[in-house]
Amino acid sequence: MTISNDKEFKAALAALDDVGRRQAAARLVQNVLDLSNDPRVKGALSLVARADASEAEIDIAAAAVKTARVESFTQCGHDTDWKSQAAHFVAVAAQECVKPSVDFASAWNAAGQARMARICRNLAEDGEGTGTREAEAQFVTLTAFLKESGS
């Protein structure tokens, strides 16, 4: 199955179990890691992309990502610094991936926050905020994940 729109994307996310949704969401957020230089976010996503991550490891990663999210929010300031805003959205997306259970809403929120991060970066670079390219990249990423995992 090749995913080509949000309806198919949502259906594919919904069909996965919690572990599969966590791994898929982590991959989607990893696509926007170039927008964040926070090692806590990167480390947490690397952890939860693995099927064998323990609950204790995920709990530690969740605490680290929460701190990163709070710190990134305070860096956004009032001047609409789009690059800082992008990094904040990456942290918010990562936080969805380190919840104790990643249900459909969490995975979908992670995807949406990743799209928002890319929109912010696009605004910072050229004044054009579009999430279409990121959505299309997510379709490709989720399709590849489903093929690799046999889902």
PLM features: what roles do these ranges have?
Residues 1-151:
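Structured binding/interaction patches within domain cores
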